[in-house]
């Protein structure tokens, strides 16, 4: 079966993302939602809104439970398919690591998708996607391969959302808007940054090679700040 469709309708659902689905049946242990071609999908009692009734449309996240059955939840996971996040390792076994992403079933990272052997209690930046063969939701710490190679259409001064990804000799690499790679230069960072931090930033420039230089202060504001200091010094000297 193919969960990779970008279209979400009554007959096409998206695994690892939120879907608007209709309540079609009430049972003792929850309600069933119309999953189109996939049949009815259970939303367990603990996630059913109090005033829920047949015919209502609910915004639910879909994933596979411990028995590989399609199941719905109204909880918001820490990452969805197609997104990047910094998550903590809950446990490991002979097959790989399992990350806490806010749902009952932990998110699997196979050994082949780990840059270094993941350790319990440590956090790692990952990308969540559907495995091509099993259609399970899995994660990869090899985030470079999931970043867009297209040239970003940003202009200088554009505000973006970033996830601090990696410390380098030049500064910090960041993932921009869940899609592109950018760089914050060490000499332009005036606060303490750590891998996994999420924040707003501004585009300083998109270089000829398509790489994005970032800055935490809106371009131009540093000049205003310099002018303010100069003016203050002038007033003090001439008071």
Where are the regions that the model predicts?
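Short aromatic-glycine-enriched beta-strand elements
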Residues: 28-32, 95-98, 169-174, 211
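Strongly charged, low-complexity linkers/loops
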Residues: 213-239
């Amino acid at each position: 079966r193919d969960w990779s469709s970008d279209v979400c309708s009554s007959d096409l659902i998206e695994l690892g993302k939120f879907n608007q689905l209709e309540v079609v049946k009430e049972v003792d242990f929850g309600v069933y939602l119309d999953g189109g071609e996939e049949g009815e999908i259970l939303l367990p009692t603990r996630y059913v809104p109090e005033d829920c009734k047949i015919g209502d449309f609910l915004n639910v996240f879909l994933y596979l439970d411990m028995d590989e059955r399609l199941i719905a939840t109204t909880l918001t996971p820490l990452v969805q398919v197609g997104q990047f996040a910094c998550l903590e390792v809950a446990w490991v076994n002979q097959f790989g690591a399992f990350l806490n992403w806010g749902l009952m079933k932990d998110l699997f990272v196979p050994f082949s998708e780990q840059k270094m052997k993941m350790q319990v209690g440590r956090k790692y930046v990952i990308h969540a996607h559907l495995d091509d063969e099993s259609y399970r939701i899995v994660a990869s710490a090899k985030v470079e391969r999931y970043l867009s190679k297209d040239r970003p259409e940003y202009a200088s001064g554009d505000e973006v959302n970033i996830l601090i990804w990696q410390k380098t000799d030049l500064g910090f690499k960041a993932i921009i808007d869940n899609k592109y790679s950018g760089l914050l230069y060490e000499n332009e960072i005036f606060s303490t940054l750590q891998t996994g931090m999420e924040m707003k930033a501004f585009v300083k420039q998109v270089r000829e090679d398509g790489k994005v230089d970032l800055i935490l202060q809106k371009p131009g504001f540093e000049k205003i700040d310099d002018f303010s200091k100069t003016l203050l010094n002038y007033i003090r000297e001439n008071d």
